[in-house]
């Protein structure tokens, strides 16, 4: 079956893992406490703080305790949805202020533009929040790439290592799984997508082997028509 849609991961795939861990996470850790204190009364922020209390099992936690919980989650690299949402808000401020620029590999930029021109529908699936995804591509070093994408998915669609998440995404974009090419640098994610019926291609940018999948070192080596 021909590929009609391409679903891509971000970290280690379109973008350097180091950008996330060495730039984005430290920025959020530094600015999150002040952001929460200043904006705790804003509805969008307050709802996320309440979600933190619920997930932590501390319904009566005050703002300072919630901040402490968030910093603990950051230290644990916990994929908590309210943490991701709040990080996204902090990053948005940073991007809008010009303090942050999203990293996207040049080979990924070129390929995504080419595939878009060829008529492939492009989607993102990352553990980072949808807002954070949109910021990386919308405020990238290569300019605004957001117009290339037809949609974004995060952990609200399910964990990235579970096949059902990929079935959910296929249904959401109204495209049979066998017509979707999924790109990632993580074998367990590729396995889950494959189990859901998707076609897979791994990115091994630093060498290595992604067992059970076709894999390449650059987006320049991916031809969707060859799958």
Curated annotation (Swiss-Prot):
Listed GO MF terms: 2,3-diketo-5-methylthiopentyl-1-phosphate enolase activity; 2-hydroxy-3-keto-5-methylthiopentenyl-1-phosphate phosphatase activity; acireductone synthase activity; magnesium ion binding
Catalysed reaction equations from the record: 5-methylsulfanyl-2,3-dioxopentyl phosphate + H2O = 1,2-dihydroxy-5-(methylsulfanyl)pent-1-en-3-one + phosphate
Top-level lineage group: Bacteria
Name under which the protein is recorded: Enolase-phosphatase E1
This protein's UniProt keywords: Amino-acid biosynthesis, Hydrolase, Magnesium, Metal-binding, Methionine biosynthesis
Known partners and oligomeric status: Monomer.
Cofactor: Mg(2+)
Gene3D superfamilies linked to this entry: 1.10.720.60, HAD superfamily/HAD-like
PANTHER family named in the record: ENOLASE-PHOSPHATASE E1 (PTHR20371:SF1)
Record CDD domains: HAD_EP
Pathway named in the protein's UniProt entry: Amino-acid biosynthesis; L-methionine biosynthesis via salvage pathway; L-methionine from S-methyl-5-thio-alpha-D-ribose 1-phosphate: step 3/6; Amino-acid biosynthesis; L-methionine biosynthesis via salvage pathway; L-methionine from S-methyl-5-thio-alpha-D-ribose 1-phosphate: step 4/6
Cofactor note (record): Binds 1 Mg(2+) ion per subunit.
Taxonomic source organism: Pseudomonas savastanoi pv. phaseolicola (strain 1448A / Race 6) (Pseudomonas syringae pv. phaseolicola (strain 1448A / Race 6))
InterPro entries the UniProt entry points to: Enolase-ppase_E1, HAD-like_sf, HAD-SF_hydro_IA, HAD_sf
Record SUPFAM superfamilies: HAD-like (SSF56784)
Similarity section: Belongs to the HAD-like hydrolase superfamily. MasA/MtnC family.
């Amino acid at each position: 079956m021909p590929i009609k849609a391409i679903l891509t991961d971000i970290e280690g795939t379109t973008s350097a893992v180091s950008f996330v861990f060495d730039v984005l996470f430290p920025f959020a850790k530094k600015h999150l406490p002040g952001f929460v204190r200043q904006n705790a009364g804003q509805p969008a922020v307050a709802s996320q703080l309440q979600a933190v209390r619920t997930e932590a099992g501390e319904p009566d936690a005050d703002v300072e305790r919630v901040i402490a919980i968030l910093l603990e989650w950051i230290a644990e690299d916990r994929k908590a949805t309210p943490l991701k949402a709040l990080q996204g808000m902090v990053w948005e401020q940073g991007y809008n202020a010009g303090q942050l620029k999203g990293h996207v590999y040049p080979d990924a930029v070129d390929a995504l533009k080419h595939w878009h021109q060829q008529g492939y529908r492009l989607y993102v699936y990352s553990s980072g929040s949808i807002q954070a995804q949109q910021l990386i591509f919308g405020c990238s070093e290569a300019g605004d790439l957001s117009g290339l994408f037809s949609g974004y998915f995060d952990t609200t669609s399910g964990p990235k290592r579970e096949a059902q998440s990929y079935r959910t995404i296929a249904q959401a974009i109204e495209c049979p799984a066998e017509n979707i090419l999924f790109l990632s640098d993580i074998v367990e994610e590729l396995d889950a997508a494959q189990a859901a019926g998707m076609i897979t291609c791994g990115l091994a940018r630093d060498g290595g082997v992604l067992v059970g999948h076709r894999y390449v070192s650059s987006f320049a080596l991916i031809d969707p028509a060859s799958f």
